[in-house]
Amino acid sequence: MLRFAPSPTGDMHIGNLRVAIFNYIVSKQLKEDLIIRIEDTDKERNIEGKDKEILEILNLFSIEYKTVFYQSDNLKYHQKMALQLMTQKKAFACFCSDEKLEELREESIKKGIPFRYDGFCENLSDEAVLNVNAPFTVRLKKPDHNIKFTDLLKGDFDYAPFDIDSFIILRQDKTPTYNYACSVDDMLMDISIVIRGEDHVSNTPKQIHIRDSLGYTKEIKYVHLPIILNAQTGKKMSKRDDASSVKWLIEQGFLPSAIANYLVLMGNKTPTEIFTLEEAIEWFKIENISKSSAKFDIDKLRFINRKHIENLDDMRLSKILGFADGDIGKLGKLFLEEASTIKEIKEKIEPIFATKTTLEGFENEFKSIKECLQKATYFDNYEDLKNYIVNETSLKGKNLFKPLRYILTGVENGPNLSDIYPLIKNYLGDIIK
């Protein structure tokens, strides 16, 4: 069993989508189920509706999964297992106030050492604990041995007890912390492999320690994917980068298939540059992912997006553009030398159907050609249409072609009219209205 475990705290980041895609591909290769686990236990950070948005994006990218699970639904198990750990003296009630902990942090900063809990509450007697009438958290005792694990990408890791510390597993309101809820749920769901971002590497020994403390012996394999950098700045893709948001990329007109293609391609060894997710399932190897940070280049994505638009069926592209006519799909592809996204193609097509009243500098010619076209019969090809206008108006050169292009396309430059006309001829009545 594999899981994709996003938090509903904001727009989906391309790094999270990459994690989802890799989990999907590997689940297909291993013929194991993929579940979506919405990690919603941090109520203060949750944003209403973001869970639904996550699922909509996954469906848009055709990422198949068995079921959707909300982490908060497991609260009773989180609390029950925490009580078990306390009963077994593997965890303890911590009454230390936020103020005291902050003082300890400040002392650590002054000494130039990492902050670690001082263990004050760990040795309180049962009687002392019962006599304290104050809110408390639950801390898991630090391990008495090193925690080791092997990452399928990054190799071996070895953490000393000092690195792991005695950490909180239940907050004062008795909701679970991230590492604790994650560990318990991975146990309950029988997760076999965890694929996630490298920012979780330091969480892994804590999660292993939690499972060890609960007597869970099944090994879970780990893959921690390198972070994604902005190719222009060399810095980590953050919320300040518009392109870090999957929602923004979709709104800009990037096809889901192209985005998925690029996220798999980045920092990877692939047999071809342009492919679909289904094709990637046939050859993808998680161990081929580079250990170095991947670089997100929006221009490279634009190139890949053009290729995916080119590969679309004409009717399919037409429907994406808001029509149901294969000729409009062909028209959209005509603009790919100048446009790279669906949004940009729409911006090229919209002027064709806009109302045009005149063309500055060619007012009389514009009027003559438009009146001529309004009286004209149907012409199947551009040459016949052009010859008809020449015969009716005696116009030629730029006096003919500039206003004619503007009437037919709404712009003064673009692909050849001989290429455009066959694709818009059936809409001529709407165009010259």
Swiss-Prot record:
Subcellular location: Cytoplasm
Positions of ATP binding: K239
Alphabetic keyword roster: Aminoacyl-tRNA synthetase, ATP-binding, Cytoplasm, Ligase, Nucleotide-binding, Protein biosynthesis
Recorded superkingdom: Bacteria
EC number: 6.1.1.17
Principal location class: cytoplasm
Residue window of motif 'KMSKS' region: 236-240
A GO molecular-function descriptor: tRNA binding
Reaction equations catalysed: tRNA(Glu) + L-glutamate + ATP = L-glutamyl-tRNA(Glu) + AMP + diphosphate
Pfam families in the record: tRNA-synt_1c
One GO process term, biological-process aspect: glutamyl-tRNA aminoacylation
Similarity comment: Belongs to the class-I aminoacyl-tRNA synthetase family. Glutamate--tRNA ligase type 1 subfamily.
Subunit and partners: Monomer.
The protein's role, per its UniProt record: Catalyzes the attachment of glutamate to tRNA(Glu) in a two-step reaction: glutamate is first activated by ATP to form Glu-AMP and then transferred to the acceptor end of tRNA(Glu).
Name assigned to this protein: Glutamate--tRNA ligase 2
Source organism per UniProt: Aliarcobacter butzleri (strain RM4018) (Arcobacter butzleri)
Gene name as annotated: gltX2
